[in-house]
């Protein structure tokens, strides 16, 4: 991957920035497809926390097998461990009641991570997260790391809900 090339799973994820849950008895077809993409077709609603389904679906769509599991923490043993974040890596966070997972795309001036993820305030979007919540960084096994591993400084709203 060259300096100017984004990880292909992040490019795929950006195509989903319009996706959000539908309140009420209807359910978002794209979110239900994320579950099918990770071989979890038994989940039939968009209220079930879907951040891991989103990450897994983006990986599967570009030919990389995900954990195919519902837990964000399942990514702590997947792929290759990284000591520091690089653009496009998977980041796993701790949160009350569980975890969260998404793709690192940058950092803000305070060095909070900017994360492209699903089920962030019920939508696919970019939000900032404090590094103090990080439990791990992972990279797909067999995939080349980016040539320029520096995180671009950008801005994003702070994450307030990932469940």
Region spans (language model):
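...with weaker cross-activation on analogous glycine-rich loops/strands in unrelated enzymes
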Residues: 4-7, 56, 64-125
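Glycine- and charge-enriched low-complexity intrinsically disordered segments
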Residues: 125-152
């Amino acid at each position: 991957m060259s300096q100017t090339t984004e990880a292909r799973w992040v490019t795929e994820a950006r195509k989903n920035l319009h996706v959000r849950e539908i309140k009420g008895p209807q359910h978002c077809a794209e979110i239900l497809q994320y579950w099918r993409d990770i071989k979890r077709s038994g989940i039939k609603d968009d209220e079930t926390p879907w951040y891991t389904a989103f990450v897994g679906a983006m990986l599967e769509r570009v030919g990389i097998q995900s954990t195919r599991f519902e837990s964000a923490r399942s990514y702590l043993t997947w792929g290759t461990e990284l000591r520091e974040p690089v653009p496009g890596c998977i980041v796993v966070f701790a949160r009350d009641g569980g975890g969260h997972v998404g793709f690192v795309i940058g950092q803000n001036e305070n060095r909070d991570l900017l994360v492209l993820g699903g089920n962030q305030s019920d939508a696919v979007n970019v939000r900032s997260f404090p590094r103090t919540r990080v439990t791990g960084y992972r990279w797909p096994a067999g995939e080349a790391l980016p040539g320029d591993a520096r995180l671009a400084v950008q801005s994003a709203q702070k994450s307030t809900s990932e469940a």
